UniProtKB/Swiss-Prot annotation:
GO terms for biological process: cell wall organization; cellulose biosynthetic process; plant-type primary cell wall biogenesis. The active site is at D280, D717. It comes from Oryza sativa subsp. japonica (Rice). It is a multi-pass membrane protein. The gene is CSLD5. Its EC number is 2.4.1.-. Residues 606-618 have a biased composition (Gly residues). Residues 20-37 have a biased composition (Low complexity). Belongs to the glycosyltransferase 2 family. Plant cellulose synthase-like D subfamily. This is Cellulose synthase-like protein D5.
Amino acid sequence: MSVDYANYTVLMPPTPDNQPSGGAPPAAPSAGGARPGDLPLPPYGSSSSSRLVNRRGGGDDGAKMDRRLSTARVPAPSSNKSLLVRSQTGDFDHNRWLFETKGTYGIGNAYWPQDNVYGDDGGGGAVKMEDLVEKPWKPLSRKVPIPPGILSPYRLLVLVRFVALFLFLVWRVTNPNMDALWLWGISIVCEFWFAFSWLLDQMPKLNPINRAADLAALKEKFESPSPTNPTGRSDLPGLDVFISTADPYKEPTLVTANTLLSILATEYPVEKLFVYISDDGGALLTFESMAEACAFAKVWVPFCRKHSIEPRNPDSYFTQKGDPTKGKKRPDFVKDRRWIKREYDEFKIRVNSLPDLIRRRANALNARERKLARDKQAAGDADALASVKAATWMADGTHWPGTWLDPSPDHAKGDHASIVQVMIKNPHHDVVYGEAGDHPYLDMTDVDMRIPMFAYLSREKRAGYDHNKKAGAMNAMVRASAILSNGPFMLNFDCDHYIYNCQAIREAMCYMLDRGGDRICYIQFPQRFEGIDPSDRYANHNTVFFDGNMRALDGLQGPMYVGTGCLFRRYAIYGFNPPRAIEYRGTYGQTKVPIDPRQGSEAMPGAGGGRSGGGSVGGDHELQALSTAHPDHEAPQKFGKSKMFIESIAVAEYQGRPLQDHPSVLNGRPPGALLMPRPPLDAATVAESVSVISCWYEDNTEWGQRVGWIYGSVTEDVVTGYRMHNRGWRSVYCITRRDAFRGTAPINLTDRLHQVLRWATGSVEIFFSKNNAVLASRRLKFLQRMAYLNVGIYPFTSLFLIMYCLLPALSLFSGQFIVATLDPTFLSYLLLITITLMLLCLLEVKWSGIGLEEWWRNEQFWVIGGTSAHLAAVLQGLLKVVAGIEISFTLTAKAAAEDDDDPFAELYLIKWTSLFIPPLAVIGINIIALVVGVSRTVYAEIPQYSKLLGGGFFSFWVLAHYYPFAKGLMGRRGRTPTIVYVWAGLISITVSLLWITISPPDDSVAQGGIDV
């Protein structure tokens, strides 16, 4: 049984038995003596706590005794998840805080003084216990290292496997198979690449860590009464939340509305939360669906606050299994839930009926316009009827400025005006409690009735402009939100991802606002999914990546940005360098060198107006240096010509700083700087937000090049995160005990392969661009560079993987093998490499918390995707780079599911795509090869079954990886589309004829084989 030990620092007070030797007893402190709050704060991790006790009347240095007590805690349960559970917020351990700052008698070390004081028993100058608990000194987060009993063997096994691979490859090179040099050569090339690929993937995993956030400390520091905040008003910074959508028919508006409701109801100060949705399609359906969601939010949000509902996505809440009354204490919960459920059902009906309602409204109003035009034409206006267009109308009887149902110039999906509509205005700065009688059915007494601000955005699109897809939409939201709210932090969501844990944002803030948090550019949350089949056939959960690779990167420079569920520092998105940036010099970046803050920094606009919401911009030496190095007149060249936007940059940087509550906190802001109410929005501000999302605003600026989301790749998220890491920023991986966010993932085989194809295509684009990690700056750590290099290289493994998957079949066809004989040395190396791989897998499962089945599913889909989507991505990328030809892979056939009520009906849909051809070929060739090999052995004059061992075993191993693919092609109850049989037959006939042509059968076939 393992026992964890926590160190305490115990400081002995000046008692009669604890006096300095050879000195007079110290005088008792007077009533007017210095109190703890009047003394300078000690730095973390120093002996300042000892000096503090001494200055309180403990005598000279001889009066201090520093002792450590080791107290054993109850060991955590033995399971894969024990490490994760222990590292989360609910089990935050303040022992380390006590050790790092000032563990004293009053905080539970040795004993609790009966009179609750230090020093004299009744002196007026005694220091009270309350004075010792000074909240600014408590850290908001901490690292939880992986136990050495797991990590040390893991690293040792990596070294052992590396040595084994090296010796194996040396042996393979020095022992060629002279009877089949072509087979030996192909296998050698593949094995060298696999070893290189394994190193790129494995080396960044050498330092995984866990983290823990302290929500209680966050509340105590930012939302509790203090001398600078007497009323306990929230001093947290503002947060802008972005939702992205593009097509209301591909991304159902009801799903988007539920995402919006979960965000509006999250636990964050209402006056500090601002929500935006970017509708890149400019659809009236999305606009009116959001308006319906805002109306429903007026009852849903207070209901969630009153009864502490979780999750706060109404669709997920009402469909989850289990007893809804569990943990609910209010007697009116059942009545309230029944009423709100009925309201939600009516809300769904209204949202689902909107397409028909909008169509009928448009038809009616267009008919009216045509009638009026005919009347004018009859009165003599010949062009009246020709000028009438089939418009789409809003509910107030005006033309919709976005995309019309029947597209026309200035009203098409790629050609429409900017739209900004603030649907929910800034809430009141003070809490607005409900009262009895405010609602006819719900008692909202003492419930905060305010709802966060919400705005609908649709950027301008015009023909002839490159709108840069999602990256362009995100940059438009960044600019508009800077004008309207200017939250120093931004959180982005896809429209199908919602907040599952209403405390998740607060946990992220613990890292951003902790000491040193000003160097963190973003907090990435793991992606969790709902609606996945229980067996996770196509590895949709992807836990090996999210719980393994990303957790390991957190121990380096931080996880990559992988899309939805990421909280950004606005200042970092603007392309600025981090404070106190360092370079990693030397062969492996082992030397850290601080750099001049002016070096390579961006323009720092001067502080000015902007919508700051309280507080002023600090003027420390670093910001002055930035401003001096890059005058303000350069800012429009980078950020555009909006003066209001440029003035907001310095305000956002200042508000995003940690509190300057300790000498060790550099580049901080004073407590209480963000307590002032925000000014209300006015027409000029909204007009400016419309201007900054126009299609011409980015002309002659650095948006998409160095500022904002980076253009030029379909995986703009990875490139954007890479650019920030390359400037020296750090990121943090935030795994919460309860999933922070949840979303949906494609469970259909074709959709899953096309998703992987898009990711792999983006990686190939990264490899052939200036974002290749080989060209990274010295601010990127060596192992972090390897991780980003692997991102650009991994699709190319498909070229070697498909050859290696065909090697067993070629061995069975030819009667040869990759080695001349099954030498004991070869088998020993193979056994050692396999055993070390299995042991590494077991230890990785231990420190990451993933399951063995999840690991195996990931391995299977790596082979499936590697021989289909990755291969297509490499082909697509090479054709684009070399010949400038762009190709696409489309769906050509679809088999309908039988049971529409089955939640996993999509799993059984078979939509034919050309991506199926390579895996089908590998499966067909290996099956035929097994038949040929078995037949050759069975019908030989002298059967030698041992000759099947090499090729037969590896061929079976390849087929085992393709089992989920084959099962997916069978559909439900074996209803496989005809096209699958056609391709399988074509492949079989082609392979058979090809082999007969190359190696016609003769009487000597029976003598073929490998020597054992």
